[in-house]
Amino acid sequence: ETDDATMTSPFDPDRPEDPLAPPPERTPLGAWVDAEDYRVRVVAVEDCEVEPYFAPRPGHRKIGVHLELTGLRDEPVPVNGLFATLLDSTGEPHRPTPAGCRPTLPAGRLEVGQTTRGFVSFEVAEDASGLLLRYQPIIVGRVPRPITFDLGR
């Protein structure tokens, strides 16, 4: 018998990791990964310069992860910076921040052969290290595997 109050949706980005799952494969900067519906790579990682009113909290900085994605299937695949999560060496997840590096990754859908690119930005501690980017779009009817990139920082 299961307790429905403790079950989490497979689409919940805050759900706990599966302790029996193998460790995620870590793709290096610049390398393409072909998922079932799309291919993706991290082009660059940069410190963001923002307007003073968007400045990070004291002791923090904003970094931008420049993503490039291409649709691989006849069915359009959703693209959105909100599908990205940044993890640091402590395992703490960081959600995207709306004010950061430009141009931002546009939200939308990619048709087969169509490519888009842009930054997804995060606010992290000045001394954050071991940064990993996990990208996992929400696709109706199934849960695509997350793709993890080693950001080399």
Predicted features, each with a name:
Residues 1-153:
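Conserved functional micro-motifs across diverse proteins
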